[in-house]
Regions:
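Short, well-structured beta-strand/strand-turn elements
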Residues: 77, 218-230, 404
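Conserved oxyanion/phosphate-binding beta-strand-loop segments in alpha/beta enzyme cores
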Residues: 138-198, 351-358
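Append "Rare intracellular matches occur via the same short Y/T/C beta-strand/loop motifs
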Residues: 91-103
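Middle-to-C-terminal accessory/interaction subdomains
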Residues: 170, 328, 341-409, 414-417, ...
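Sec-dependent signal peptide cleavage junction
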Residues: 15-28
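Internal "kinase-insert"/substrate-recognition segments embedded within catalytic cores
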Residues: 183-184, 198, 220-222, 237-397
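Predominantly extracytoplasmic/ectodomain segments of secreted and cell-surface proteins
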Residues: 25-89, 105-106
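Positively charged n-region of N-terminal signal peptides that target proteins for export
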Residues: 1-8
Length: 607
């Protein structure tokens, strides 16, 4: 009978793809005691690796004799065969064995890099609610230290919550945080609101940092500032992150007037409710689930009329984001251009109807001019009368240099300062974890993994039809059309050879290499924590990390060489390879248009 059960169990493991060793490791994890190291008043729990062994992740390589470990277990506990008094011991060696309940648990100390560290403790003592709902906010406390261990902030945490779109679906989560007091963290400017970027899909952890560094070097205004840091939540090591400034209307971030503050002040004054929640105000316009598909529509928040004595300058400031149609629904304010491009409002998030009318009209005139044969819209305005040519050129060059698949589609920003004569500006840059050949490869015939091929200048809209990923319409992006304009190409060429090319070459040759060495130990710890390479062997993880960083460096270097020779040749016809036969594609376009007509004519746009 025992042999029969053994055969059945072996068959179950074989069919499930799970090894007996893995099963035993999972069982041991469930029964394992919790071991917590006290590092300067901060708890650091050991982590159960995929190999069935346990890991303490700390930044201090000279740890011997400094830190006390507490073992939470019932019954006697042993360290390397010696019984512990009070179930505590002083960490001495880089590895050892804890015995509890007759089971041995081997542990290792993994030293991270000398990076800043962030320790977050939530009120519940858990991150489960945050991970279950991206919008859930949890308060707590937070300690932030610089690379020398000096305190940058130690106090209340108003909240930690999820952030991101596709990145939120990954194992290692990105977060937004709000601390209780405006603080100038690491000299990045005073603010309460910050982001923690996980870079889970980027094994080098360097793509976002490389682009932000390069954008700062070439003078793209309001580029996010950042530091690498190791993050712990409730004692659990989460890996290496970017602590980064957020894109918001703020004199220390994007220096434009904050219309959200103005609108909230008016709404409170008009309602007489000091505790008014802006989310309680009704939406207006086309705000339903399918609104992002319907060209020429707008949505806003019904801000009450300003009481006597209040004035509003609706000329600015604005921060706009190009977005995919399937994400448009979740935003409070926005508009869809006549060429199907959804634009959401980063600021003001709660835009009034008058503000939406103003900014959507301005952007539409810009788009019309870009797509016109002579670069002028029906009013005779040239696109450079409406938008700043230099920022457009710099933004495009950064995007083309890193071969970013998302540029012109999503996470693509414009801002407009207040003033009737002020222009739209391209930027700030944001979100480059799938750049530099770290993506699905080809789209519309462009190979984003080939450093010697133009990509962004051939960009097409994506998912802005009812068919989602099938995307049957292939409408060109604004940057696609700009790259056919002689004056735009000339501006790119002039700026490149005036110094931008050299700065991007320096980023590729020096910044990426040097920074990879700086963060390597934390990248290795992160690789073990998240089983990135399928092994917990630190030496093997380090080898794999070096390969990932070298690939990025080589890609960026090759990309810089390619653009140095070919940038002046961007002025070419758009390039599309249909993913569907022409007949089927045309049929689906007609179905899409019929669907949109039904939504509009039967007044389903807000359903």
């Amino acid at each position: 009978m025992k042999k029969f059960l053994a055969v059945i169990l072996a068959l179950v493991f074989a069919l499930s793809g799970m090894s007996v060793m893995a099963f035993a490791a999972d069982k041991d994890k469930a029964q394992a005691p919790l071991c917590t190291l006290n590092k300067d008043g901060n708890a650091v729990n050991w982590f159960g690796g995929e190999d069935g062994e346990y890991y303490f992740f700390i930044s201090d390589s000279d740890f011997a004799g400094k830190y006390t470990v507490t073992v939470k277990a019932s019954g006697d506990v042993y360290l390397d065969g010696a019984k512990l008094e009070d179930n505590t011991f002083v960490l001495g060696s880089a590895e050892g064995t804890i015995t509890s309940g007759g089971v041995d648990y081997k542990y290792h100390v993994v030293c991270t890099a000398k990076l800043p560290a962030v320790y977050i403790t939530t009120e519940s003592g858990s991150m489960d609610a945050v991970h279950a709902d991206k919008s859930h906010k949890e308060a707590g406390t937070i300690r932030i230290y610089n690379e020398k261990g000096k305190t940058e902030y130690d106090g209340a945490l108003d909240y930690i919550k999820g952030r991101g779109n596709s990145s939120w679906e990954m194992a290692k989560k990105p977060y937004n945080i709000k601390i209780a007091k405006k603080t100038n963290l690491f000299g990045m400017g005073k603010s309460k609101k910050w982001s923690l970027i996980a870079n889970y899909s980027d094994n080098s952890h360097l793509r976002n940092a490389a682009v932000y560094y390069a954008a700062q070097q070439i003078g793209l205004d309001y580029t996010p500032k950042f530091v690498f840091c190791d993050v712990y939540t409730n004692g659990d090591y989460q890996g290496v992150y970017l602590l980064i400034t957020r894109i918001e209307a703020n004199s220390k971030r994007v220096d434009v007037a904050n219309l959200d503050d103005v609108n909230e002040e008016i709404a409170i004054a008009a309602s007489g409710n000091e505790d008014l929640d802006m989310d309680s105000l009704p939406q207006g316009g086309a705000y339903g689930r399918f609104a992002g598909l319907i060209e020429g529509t707008k949505k806003w928040v019904e801000i009450p009329e300003a009481p006597e004595g209040y004035t509003v300058d609706n000329t600015g400031g604005y921060i706009l984001e190009m977005e995919l149609a399937n994400r448009y629904y979740g935003e409070k304010s926005g508009f869809v251009t006549t060429r199907s491009q959804p634009i959401t409002m980063k600021s003001p998030e709660y835009a009034s109807q008058a503000q939406m009318e103003y900014i959507s009209d301005l952007y539409q005139r810009f788009e019309d001019a870009v797509f016109a044969g002579n670069g002028r819209n029906a009013l005779g305005e040239h696109y450079t009368d409406i938008a700043d040519l230099e920022s457009l050129a710099k933004y495009y060059m950064i995007s083309e240099w890193c071969s970013n698949m998302d540029s012109g589609l999503t996470s693509t920003y414009f801002y407009k300062p207040e003033g009737a004569d002020s222009k739209l500006f391209a930027g700030p840059v944001w979100d480059y974890d799938i750049a530099f050949g770290n993506n699905e490869g080809t789209r519309y015939g462009c190979n984003y993994n080939n450093p010697e091929e133009f990509t962004v200048c051939f960009g097409r809209q994506y998912r802005n039809t009812v068919f989602g990923k099938l995307d049957v319409d292939y409408k060109p992006t604004v940057y696609n059309r700009l790259c056919r304009r002689p004056e735009f190409v000339e501006a790119c060429r002039r700026l490149w050879y005036a110094g931008i090319g050299d700065k991007l070459a320096e980023t590729a040759a020096e910044y990426i290499f040097n920074t990879s060495r700086t963060i390597k130990a934390s990248a290795v710890a992160d690789g073990i924590r998240w089983n990135i390479y399928g092994t917990c062997d630190a030496a093997k993880v380090a080898e794999n990390y070096e390969v990932a960083a070298a690939y990025l460096e080589d890609f960026a270097t090759a990309r810089t060489r390619f653009l140095d020779v070919n940038l002046g040749r961007v002025q070419v016809q758009g390039k599309v390879k249909d993913q569907l036969p022409a007949g089927l594609r045309n049929f689906l376009v007609r179905v899409n248009n019929l669907f949109e007509a039904v939504i509009v004519n039967f007044k389903l746009i807000n359903k």
